[in-house]
Amino acid sequence: MPSIRVALFADFHFSTPSDLEVLSTLKRQMIAENPDLVLFAGDYIGSHDLYDDVSRETVVKSLEALAFPKPAFAVLGNHDNWDSNEAWSDAFEGSSITLIENQVERISLNGQAICIRGLGDIYSGYWKGLEIPAKCEQRAITLTHDPAGLLTPNATVETLSFAGHTHCGQVAFPLIGAPIVPTRAPRDMHCGQFDREGKGVVSGGLGSSIIPLRFGPLTAPGWELIDINSVN
């Protein structure tokens, strides 16, 4: 079965036009890596106070250019929801990026039929329980913002899953790690790969929140490239 290459981006936290300049570098990296699928895990703005110099529409168009011509799916993060869930949903509507909030889309990639389940952000109160439809034949991946939204009542994960939100702590110190990570997800789901019956990846993301600083060996900004050999 052919593999699927997934690009995962999270937590851009755009606040000014200059913040968008990073996208030209990311685009060059994307062209070089040639993913089959692009996932955006939310938090596109820097704060929930509406800013005038970078509109939602500008952000969405910039993300479209980054993903083009690959199929792309997105969920909203807590900062986007605190700004306006409705306005961000409107900004994505009609774009080439499918906003997949609490719904499932079935697509074909490399000859495989795969379901993508998008879950609303649990941290800001937009999460809804959503079962994987039978039509997905156990071939599904899940995308959400806060990794806490991936957990079942038994603290397991149902599908191959992707999230962001944590910034891998953003500020982390030797020995003690990050003093604050704003999620109810367990520590093994704060950063990078995890395995809770279902496997997944939590991206540390690209931007910063509250303070313009990242500190610590695992907190450097970045995006994830994941090669999936099978989806089951």
Predicted regions mapped to residue ranges:
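Short acidic-hydrophobic surface loop/beta-edge motif
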Residues: 1, 103-110, 190-196
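N-terminal signal-anchor transmembrane helix
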Residues: 1-36
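Active-site-proximal beta-strand elements of phosphoester/diester hydrolases
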Residues: 3-13, 113-122, 141-145, 198-205
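Active-site neighborhood of phospho(di)ester-bond hydrolases with catalytic His/Asp-centered motifs
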Residues: 9-10, 37-43, 71-78, 100-103, ...
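Short active-site segment of divalent metal-dependent hydrolases/proteases
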Residues: 14, 45-46, 148, 168
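Core catalytic region of metal-dependent phosphoesterases/phosphodiesterases
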Residues: 22-108
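Binuclear metal-dependent hydrolase catalytic cores centered on His/Asp/Glu-rich metal-binding motifs
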Residues: 90, 94-97, 101-103, 109-152, ...
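Conserved beta-sheet core of the metallophosphoesterase superfamily
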Residues: 147-228
